[in-house]
């Protein structure tokens, strides 16, 4: 018997794939045209840029164009011509051309930073555009570093920009960071934070660190003067299951804009020696109440493994192994359950979906409202962990034969939930849906929305 519903789903999937391929081809062709135009205008290729760590000869005077362009900051008493010259001869490396890196780069280039390095291994996606303001719809599929470079050169063609379209790691970090004066950590993962911290301490580079999640943001400067480094504050990385990035927790684009702009400001202050640097202090921004708090953080740790007088770590290590998580902002898939506690989406669709079962969606209510599987019941992970779900499902839990399936967006929170429920009800059949709703879209129903 022909399953017309399955055939229709496959037809829709193929049509969508073909449309995506055509759109991607158009984007790639547009990107190629822009790159060729940039090269024709005299921009160096990546290979030529990265073949040497030497920065151009320092400039000793401002041009008429400089004076006209930067006049509003030149007239600042604490900035002036000498400040602009320092900025013109400076070099800043931005790691991560996402929600923080884009506004930071934009303001540094606009202010007249002479040399900018951009690092990002990833490509532009549509889900980036609400906060990563240098990218555009027609550059989806393009390297983020290259996309940002195109936008930045339109803003200020006098800035020298190097693109590093790769993942920064223990093998290349020292070589990449060495020629720059200041490093901005605009990444979204713990492993990269430790990597940048250690490399910057070893190379004596100040590290301007920013982060943003949901409606909140933070900013500080590590490894500057007598201030602490990142390891002084966090000598041991958090467990992977305790880490939330903006892909999981969400973020409002304007929040990343605020923090990224402040990272640019701190970099400018470091370069020209303006004001008090945020070393030894942490700026906390609460976007919900629009409150800023400036708190003191601990001083240098005398026995810090990296920045102390007798460091135990004198060369870069394997940071993914050290942190137990990937050095990217992509999903770090958890592996908490035994194979018999996991259920593939195709198996669920073909066998269990038509049988009596309890399907619990452990996403927050806001995410459940976006999309949900038929017959799924929303029970947020927080309710499972505090056991408030027990009264709600007391009757179903009495039936040890009733299969219980838990799902989430990508298959991580559902594993945590299965672990918790299984500890209380070890005799029940409780499984999680591998890969969550993303796997459902990829393997079962191509029309189901992805977010």
UniProtKB/Swiss-Prot annotation:
Binds 1 zinc ion per subunit. Its EC number is 2.7.7.80, 2.8.1.11. The modification Phosphothreonine is found at residue 60. Residues 43-52 have a biased composition (Acidic residues). Its cofactor is Zn(2+). ATP binds at residues 99, 120, 127-131, 144, 188-189. Zn(2+) binds at residues 229, 232, 304, 307. It catalyses: [molybdopterin-synthase sulfur-carrier protein]-C-terminal Gly-Gly + ATP + H(+) = [molybdopterin-synthase sulfur-carrier protein]-C-terminal Gly-Gly-AMP + diphosphate; [molybdopterin-synthase sulfur-carrier protein]-C-terminal Gly-Gly-AMP + S-sulfanyl-L-cysteinyl-[cysteine desulfurase] + AH2 = [molybdopterin-synthase sulfur-carrier protein]-C-terminal-Gly-aminoethanethioate + L-cysteinyl-[cysteine desulfurase] + A + AMP + 2 H(+). Residues 42-62 are annotated as: Disordered. The keyword tRNA processing applies. Keywords: ATP-binding, Cytoplasm, Metal-binding, Molybdenum cofactor biosynthesis, Multifunctional enzyme, Nucleotide-binding, Phosphoprotein, Transferase, tRNA processing, Zinc. GO terms for biological process: Mo-molybdopterin cofactor biosynthetic process; protein urmylation; tRNA wobble position uridine thiolation. GO terms for cellular component: cytosol. It is found in: Cytoplasm. It holds the Pfam family ThiF. CDD domains: ThiF_MoeB_HesA_family. Pathway: tRNA modification; 5-methoxycarbonylmethyl-2-thiouridine-tRNA biosynthesis; Cofactor biosynthesis; molybdopterin biosynthesis. GO terms for molecular function: ATP binding; metal ion binding; molybdopterin-synthase adenylyltransferase activity; molybdopterin-synthase sulfurtransferase activity; thiosulfate-cyanide sulfurtransferase activity; URM1 activating enzyme activity. It comes from the Eukaryota. The active site is at 246 (glycyl thioester intermediate), 408 (cysteine persulfide intermediate). Plays a central role in 2-thiolation of mcm(5)S(2)U at tRNA wobble positions of cytosolic tRNA(Lys), tRNA(Glu) and tRNA(Gln). Also essential during biosynthesis of the molybdenum cofactor. Acts by mediating the C-terminal thiocarboxylation of sulfur carriers URM1 and MOCS2A. Its N-terminus first activates URM1 and MOCS2A as acyl-adenylates (-COAMP), then the persulfide sulfur on the catalytic cysteine is transferred to URM1 and MOCS2A to form thiocarboxylation (-COSH) of their C-terminus. In the N-terminal section; belongs to the HesA/MoeB/ThiF family. UBA4 subfamily. This is Adenylyltransferase and sulfurtransferase MOCS3-1.
């Amino acid at each position: 018997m022909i399953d017309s519903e399955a055939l229709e789903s496959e037809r829709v999937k193929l049509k969508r794939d073909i449309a995506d391929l055509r759109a991607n081809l158009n984007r790639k062709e547009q990107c190629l045209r822009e790159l060729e135009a940039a090269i024709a205008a005299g921009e160096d290729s990546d290979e030529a840029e990265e073949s040497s760590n030497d920065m151009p000869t320092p400039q000793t005077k401002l041009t008429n164009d400089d004076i006209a362009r930067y006049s509003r900051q030149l007239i600042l008493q604490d900035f002036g011509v000498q400040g602009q010259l320092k900025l013109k001869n400076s070099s800043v490396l931005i790691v991560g051309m996402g929600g923080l890196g884009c506004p930071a780069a934009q303001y540094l280039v606009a202010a007249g930073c002479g040399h900018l390095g951009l690092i990002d291994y990833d490509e532009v996606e549509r889900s980036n555009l609400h906060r990563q303001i240098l990218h555009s719809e027609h550059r989806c599929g393009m390297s983020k570093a290259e996309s940002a470079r195109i936008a930045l050169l339109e803003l200020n063609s006098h800035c020298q920009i190097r693109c590093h379209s790769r993942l920064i790691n223990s093998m290349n970090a020292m070589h990449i960071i060495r020629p720059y004066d200041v490093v901005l950590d605009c990444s979204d993962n713990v492993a990269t934070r430790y990597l940048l911290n250690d490399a910057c301490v070893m190379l004596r580079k100040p590290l301007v660190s920013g982060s943003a999640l949901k409606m909140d943001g933070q900013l500080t400067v590590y490894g500057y003067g007598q201030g602490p480094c990142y390891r002084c504050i966090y000598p041991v990385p958090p467990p992977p299951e305790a880490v939330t990035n903006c892909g999981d927790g969400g973020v409002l684009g304007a929040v990343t804009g605020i923090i990224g702009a402040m990272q640019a400001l701190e970099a400018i202050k470091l370069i020209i020696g303006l004001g008090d640097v945020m070393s030894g202090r942490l700026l906390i921004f609460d976007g919900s109440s629009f409150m800023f708090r400036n708190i003191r953080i601990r001083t240098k740790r005398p026995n810090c493994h990296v920045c102390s007088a007798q460091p135990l770590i004198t060369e870069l290590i394997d940071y993914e192994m050290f942190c137990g998580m990937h050095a990217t902002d992509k999903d770090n898939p958890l592996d908490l359950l035994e194979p018999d506690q996991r259920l593939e989406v195709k198996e669920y669709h073909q066998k269990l979906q038509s049988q009596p079962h309890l399907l619990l969606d452990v996403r927050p209510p806001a995410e459940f409202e976006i999309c949900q599987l038929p017959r799924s019941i929303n029970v947020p992970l927080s309710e499972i962990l505090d056991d408030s779900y027990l009264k709600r499902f007391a009757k179903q839990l009495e039936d040890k034969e009733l299969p219980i399936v838990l799902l989430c967006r990508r298959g991580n929170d559902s594993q945590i939930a299965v672990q918790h429920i299984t500890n209380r009800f070890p005799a029940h059949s409780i499984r999680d849906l591998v890969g969550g709703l993303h796997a459902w879209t990829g393997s079962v129903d191509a029309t189901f929305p992805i977010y």
